[in-house]
Amino acid sequence: ITGHTVEVGVEKIAVVRCNGSCQNRPRPRTYDGARSCAVAAMMNGGETGCFFGCLGCGDCVKACKFDAIKMDPETGLPVVDQDKCTACGACAKACPRQIIELRNKNKLDRRVYVSCVNKDKGPVAKKACDAACIGCGKCVKACPFEAITLENNLAYIDFEKCRLCRKCVDECPQHSIMAVNFPPKPTENN
């Protein structure tokens, strides 16, 4: 009826695909206008040097009717409360940079994903953000399941093929690939 397809029985969650925290990216400009991501994106691209990442004004927070997303004052990035998120998609629709995606949850709610949407070439992306994917391809080579491809200087993970082995996380020199809800890896002392 609505024209949308729904996967029956597949629970989803909102995922923020930006790791460009206050510590990771320079702020070469000062945005003095309305505190709105939509306005900042139209005016001067916001305060950071990354024209792909989070603008930090919280349009996603304002859009969420379930109080499931908050701005982290330390990082300046939105954080999703996994227990409150209903995967309604309001936050994703509110983001002018399209950094929020709805992803399938698995039984243990473990996820591996690229926390960057910057499509600039390596040196340009790295200058904009210390955590930017630079399209080096190390993750592609490390993945034994051929679940990762490079497209427009950015790594993409095929979640149908990914087996959550986290070899890509270990190989990423930029720490652009995130692993969520995994137990800590054993250290040499354990």
Q: Could you tell me what each predicted segment is?
A:
Residues 1-136, 140-142, 171, 175-190:
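Ferredoxin-type iron-sulfur electron-transfer modules and their immediate structural context
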Residues 134, 138, 144-156:
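Strongly charged, low-complexity linkers/loops
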